[in-house]
């Protein structure tokens, strides 16, 4: 068996990777249109990143949405190339390019050192959200790079207006322990999250027990690009509110009991098991119980017909039954 890791009032977000502060880089053969005004297809944008097999490309063509919105400052243009997702999750690909065609990154900079400030992609929804970002560098000497941003929310996001706000591109100086600006500028671009939602929702009601508590699975939303699991715990979470600005040991253990220890496994028809437990989400006390949401975007497009089952806390849902 192969196991892989993928990725209200007083409601507490649980983040796996800080939005826009990622330091991961993928070295891929990904072409970029830069600021040429070319509107690239969703498949052209996403296939090199999330899978280029025929079944994956077919899905991307169906649910992806080319954007092309851009903003320029200080000779550098940020373009939102395309977006795809489902009702509660989305992935946006941005291109950062130097308008004169010269090298974007200094010679001593590598992709894993990059980060950008700003608010990231704001969806202006009345609900909680979490996400991550990383940079894609095909050629360190090129005039452009890509940034991939994922967003997951507890409210529908596939029919809203997004505003991307970014300020300065930085390198992380490990020796100094601080971010140093390498490209200065402020970019603001607005676009519609108009993509097709291909998700299915599995009705809940099943329960499981662990850590001395009973968990009720409220619903599971699953699509070729992401997942979301909503569940309710039969006791109300209590936070220490230490006021230090850092998570206390007590709160860390509480987060584990209510959230991190909830195992989510996706089994594919070929027998592969994907561990989805290490996800972001939210934990919220509510009238004697705790309402939780857990989910994120997959690392690659997964056709629904390739999914055999999904389990939450040991409760198995058969995905092959029509």
What residue spans do the PLM features occupy?
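Alpha-helical, hydrophobic structural elements that either
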Residues: 31-322
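Conserved small/polar residues in nucleotide/adenosyl-binding loops
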Residues: 1-5
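Internal signal-anchor transmembrane helix that establishes type II topology
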Residues: 10-36
